[in-house]
């Protein structure tokens, strides 16, 4: 999947670093928020959070 990095850092939903990605196509699990906490803004199902080692630039 491809997209734009919109967030890098710690989150409230899980320990450790995360990368928030706005996907080019729907297929994500969120809109940039998780459990009511907004990390970045995008359309529903276009947001995804992945571990940094899963990101290719």
Where on the chain are the PLM-derived regions?
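Ser/Thr/Pro-rich, acidic low-complexity intrinsically disordered regulatory segments
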Residues: 1-57
């Amino acid at each position: 999947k491809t997209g734009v990095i919109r967030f890098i850092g710690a989150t409230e939903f899980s320990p450790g670093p995360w990368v928030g990605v706005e996907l080019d196509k729907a297929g994500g699990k969120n809109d940039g928020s998780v459990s009511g906490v907004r990390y970045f803004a995008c359309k529903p199902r276009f947001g995804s959070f992945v571990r940094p080692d899963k990101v290719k630039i």
